[in-house]
Structures are given as structure tokens and as C-alpha cells.
């Protein structure tokens, strides 16, 4: 199987909201135990949403899943605070498009297509987990790369994409999503 077989899906993402999309080898995806600790100590969403730790796979489980794949796609979107995005709606539409793309890839025969997004889930204003109820959007909810222990910074850099820590609140954000394919 060729990485180039995935170009049509990259093109679809680029036609929608993606800034960049590139087929990659899963061996370039880095997992590490410290990543999950950054969620636990530093993110207010820890334990409050089904898409956040501790309700997500561990880095070790994630690495075992990644090892089952030969190809993947890395997607990038630049989010500029204060732009015409109206509170990040463009980013949310991007994530929604990627979930649809995952379904399309499944229908095209990529039955192992598996998507990881960025940041905490925002499908509901208030996650049903807080009420002890099941996820209301289990068909569309996807965990973030960082929530499953993927070192987004190193993974992105391994594949020639740009990323750096934010220096100021108003700095452009570079958000990434990962689709494991086969």
C-alpha cells in the first residue's frame, strides 16, 4: 500500500478547512507517559469528559493500537484568536468534517480508519459524564491525541510540520488531528 493512495482524502480536507494534510507513517507518531500527566495537571477538563483521561486509552494502549497500522494522515488547521472564526466555529467544523471523512474512508474499504482530534470534546455544552449518564454523541466523539498519550509536538515535528508553544494568549494556534488508516 502506498501513502499516495491517501492523497484524495488529504485533498478533501484541504478543500474544506485544513491548512495542511499529509500522509505519514505511524512509526513517526510518538507516545509518552508524561503527555497524559499534562492533561491531569494543567487541564481543567481532566476527568470531566468522556474524551479526556482517565476515560481514554493509556499511552501504552495507544502505542499498541498505532503498531497495528501502516499508514496515517496528519491534518493541520491554524486557528487565529479574534479572527472571523466566531469562537472557534471553524475549528469545530473542521473536526466535524474529519469525523465524516473517517466514515467515508470506512465506506471506501479502510475499515480500520481511526481518528484522534485535538483538545477536549466540545460536542455538548455540558458532558453527560458529570450527570453519570452515557455519552450523548458516542458516534461522533473522538479523543484528542494528547488525551491518549500522543506527543503532538514531537509527532508533528517528525513529519515536517510547524508547531511551537504559545507565548501569548492571542498567538495563532496550530491544531493537529491524526487519522490512522490501515
Functional labels for PLM-detected ranges:
Residues 3-6, 20-22, 28-49, 54-182:
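Catalytic cores of enzyme domains
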Residues 10:
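Short alpha-helix
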